[in-house]
Amino acid sequence: MKEKSSPIGCFRYGEDLSYCTFALEFLLCLDLQSNGLFNRTQNHVIMKLWNFFRKFSLPCSLVIGAVGYLIFAYVPFLEPLGEAVGPHLISLMPVVLFALLYVTFCKIEIKEMKPKAWHFILQLIRTSLALMMVVLIFEFGNDYNTKLILEGAFICFICPTAAAVAVVTEKLGGSIGSLTTYTVIANIFTMVIIPSLFPMVEKGADVSFLYMSLMVFRNVTTVLVVPLLLALLSRRFLPKFVDKVKSVKDLGFYMWCFNLTILMGETVRNILHATVSGWILVLLLIVPLFVCLIQFAIGKAVGRHFDASISAGQALGQKNTIVGIWLTLTFLNPLAAVAPGAYVVWQNLVNGWQLWYKEKYGKLKW
């Protein structure tokens, strides 16, 4: 019996097949083709979203963190889940930070860890900026609201460099080793200047040198020294494992994005629960933007003289705001903690813009 192809080219049927069978075949082919088209469309959408996230990783992390907090805090049936999971996510942050620093330090060049002149110049600038804020607080601190805003700016100037600064610096093309050394030096300076200046800002702030020394020592040891030593030992005894870690592109950076999402959620929570309002709240959110731009600009300006504008800009501009918030809540006016929380947003928007510009044009504009 002669066969002929079906009009859709997917099946063959005999002349004696009923039109009903043919119709079923036709519908089946349409279903298969539509499923294939749906899968291709779905994959295309996923790739477009992923490429968008890669291009704007830091701003996307900020938005995801903020929106995620708002959903789980204000959608009634999701509130219990948010209250249960939130603390666990926050407790996970130090673990992720440790892991991302280990991954980053696997790529470190020991010869780059030699202290540089700009490391100490930036510490003097950082201390001078903090002292300038202390003078302004002495001058205009009689007004409660003015003092609150100045305290917010003060903590943004004085808090040390972020431990994860090397991750963003690596993507921008700076030196991981040099930033690691700078971060250690910055924490040592912190041990001296915070106990010295905090009592001038808040007379009730009794910060002993011993207490601050132990806090800084614990911070430097657990966050920086241990992952650095593990990375160096891994390079010596587990070179194949290190090669596999290094082969995963931007692994440490995406770990940082995960932490940033959680940090942004916590920042939004602090801002929404702040008992200040109106122009005072607006200023506590806006002043850190100018502090952020000033520090990035000064750092880059100093770094240009040492062929290290990227590293120096990140060193002075990217702050450990978690420590800043803790210091404010513990020793200063707790309401001023809104400022270092806002600084998280501004510094990551600056970094996000720098990363976008470098990927688009192959160089940094600033």
Give each language-model segment a name.
Residues 5, 26, 34:
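Cationic, low-complexity basic patches in intrinsically disordered or flexible, solvent-exposed regions
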Residues 39-40, 44-366:
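Alpha-helical transmembrane segments of multi-pass small-molecule/ion transporters
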Residues 16-19, 31, 39, 43:
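Intrinsic-disorder-associated, low-complexity terminal segments enriched in Asp/Asn/His/Tyr and depleted
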Residues 1, 8, 45-46:
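Short hydrophobic transmembrane-like helices used for membrane targeting/insertion
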Residues 4-6, 15-17:
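N-terminal amphipathic/hydrophobic targeting modules at extreme N-termini
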Residues 1-2, 30:
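Compositionally biased, low-complexity segments
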